[in-house]
């Protein structure tokens, strides 16, 4: 999700009711040939514009749960009981895919970054959070769920570009809340794709994560069937028109590196679409046509992008859906052209009055969710053979979507997140409860369940 700076009231915290889950696991070593063979057919692969899992077309409704590795840990911020309960609740409503962050990097205090950190200094990783990632991967497998794991962030709420640039002598990432701060942040982040030292540190991190052996399952990550895709970054951008060539080279080099370590799993960019490519659809096509990028991604944020007024987003819901539909169609045309699947891996709409917290009406959000889900659901067509009269299903390029995001039993306590607060899907610097879906958002959950039945079959 992107940087945003709205100040809004947060409602009081409600009590979480947690239930236990079994954390005992059996060690399985993928060093054994029979284990490797056993998991081989369970990887998510692609065939043209379709994903394939267990020998069948794989389409899904997923969600974003960036905080998974921290919540699934046993250290600061960890709550395995809640984590397992969230997975159970998501599975029950038909959500089968999670998009998660590998773990936060040390970030600028000006950004109110997510804590605790996985990467405290270049190459220095927090074993507790790594074990949380191990646990998350293992628990997803138990429930036949999959994960997209992103390895970096263009935004400094989890360190990201700012972590590497600070280590290269550029200082802390600029405070975007100050006058002119956003433009300074953009100029600052443009250095990432063209600074070889920063890139080399990032590549070293990729090697550490992707080549890891899971302490719970005993498998190397490359052999974990619950990992669907490694993702280069959350919302990577060139951050300047002059930076497009360096940006495209970075995307290609990072994807090739991951494939050299792990040829079993898909690789994706994490791009927002042309919005994240300086509105250059040709650049978007170029980076996704790369042989090591397996599918296309887009994000859709009507309120953040000005397709709905911040003061009254509900009044613009029809226009927001219209613009979103056009955005989807433009990128789906690219997906068909280069013969790869497309996923809307982030989308969201705020509550009534652009407020945040629980108990606030979600009528417009529900309409927006229904619109996005229907785009995925209608992407499957029943085709009748004119000669034989037999029918078969033909899939379009739009293969899945992940709403932003799941808070479940978590509840907001402060205006912005503070250590000790529940993790929600709203990043720490944003109003807590702004885009999150809580387990008490019954109308939204009913819509998710309804469309999941159609899309998942």
Residue ranges and their predicted role:
Residues 18-20:
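C-terminal motif of bacterial Sec signal peptides marking the signal peptidase cleavage site
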Residues 22-29:
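Bacterial lipoprotein signal-peptidase II cleavage site
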Residues 1-10:
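Bacterial N-terminal signal peptides that target proteins for export
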Residues 38-308, 315-341, 347-376, 380-455:
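Active-site mouth of glycoside hydrolases
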Residues 32-34:
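Carbohydrate-interacting/catalytic domains
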């Amino acid at each position: 999700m992107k940087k945003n700076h709205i100040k809004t009231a947060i409602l009081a915290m409600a009590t979480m009711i947690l239930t236990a889950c079994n954390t005992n696991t059996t060690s399985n070593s993928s060093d054994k040939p029979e284990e490797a063979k056993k998991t081989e057919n369970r990887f998510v692969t692609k065939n043209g514009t379709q994903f394939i899992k267990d020998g069948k077309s794989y389409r899904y409704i997923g969600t974003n749960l960036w905080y998974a590795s921290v919540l699934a840990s046993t250290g600061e911020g960890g709550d395995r009981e809640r984590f397992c309960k969230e997975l159970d609740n998501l599975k029950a409503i038909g959500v089968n895919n999670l998009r998660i962050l590998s773990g936060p990097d040390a970030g600028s205090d000006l950004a109110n970054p997510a804590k605790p950190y996985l990467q405290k200094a270049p190459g220095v990783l927090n074993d507790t959070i790594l074990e949380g990632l191990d646990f998350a991967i293992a628990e997803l497998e138990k429930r036949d769920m999959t994960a997209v794991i992103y390895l970096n962030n263009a935004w400094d709420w989890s360190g990201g570009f700012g972590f590497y640039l600070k280590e290269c002598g550029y200082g802390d990432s600029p405070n975007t809340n100050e006058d002119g701060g956003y433009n300074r942040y953009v100029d600052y982040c443009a250095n990432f794709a063209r600074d070889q030292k920063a890139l080399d540190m990032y590549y070293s991190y990729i090697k550490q994560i992707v080549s890891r052996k899971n302490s719970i399952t005993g498998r190397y990550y490359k052999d974990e069937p619950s990992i669907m895709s490694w993702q280069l970054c959350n919302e990577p951008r060139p951050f300047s028109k002059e930076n497009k060539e360096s940006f495209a080279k970075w995307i290609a080099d990072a994807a090739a590196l991951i494939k050299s370590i792990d040829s079993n799993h898909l690789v994706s960019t994490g791009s927002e679409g042309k919005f994240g490519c300086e509105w250059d659809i040709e650049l978007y096509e170029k980076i996704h046509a790369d042989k090591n990028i397996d599918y296309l991604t887009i994000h859709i944020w009507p309120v953040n992008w000005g397709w709905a007024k911040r003061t009254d987003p509900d009044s613009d819901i029809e226009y927001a859906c219209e613009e979103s539909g056009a955005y989807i169609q433009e990128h789906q045309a690219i997906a068909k052209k280069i013969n790869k699947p497309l996923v809307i891996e982030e989308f969201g709409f705020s509550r009534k009055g652009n407020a945040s917290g629980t108990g606030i009406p979600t009528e417009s959000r529900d309409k927006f969710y229904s619109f996005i889900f229907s785009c995925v659901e209608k992407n499957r067509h029943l085709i009748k053979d004119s000669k034989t009269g037999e029918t078969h299903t033909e899939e379009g390029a739009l293969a899945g979507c992940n709403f932003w995001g799941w808070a479940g039993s978590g509840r907001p306590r402060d205006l912005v997140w503070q250590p000790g607060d529940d993790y929600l899907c709203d990043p720490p610097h944003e109003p807590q409860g702004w885009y999150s879906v809580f387990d008490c958002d019954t109308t939204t959950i009913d819509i998710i369940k309804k469309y999941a039945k159609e899309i998942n079959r």
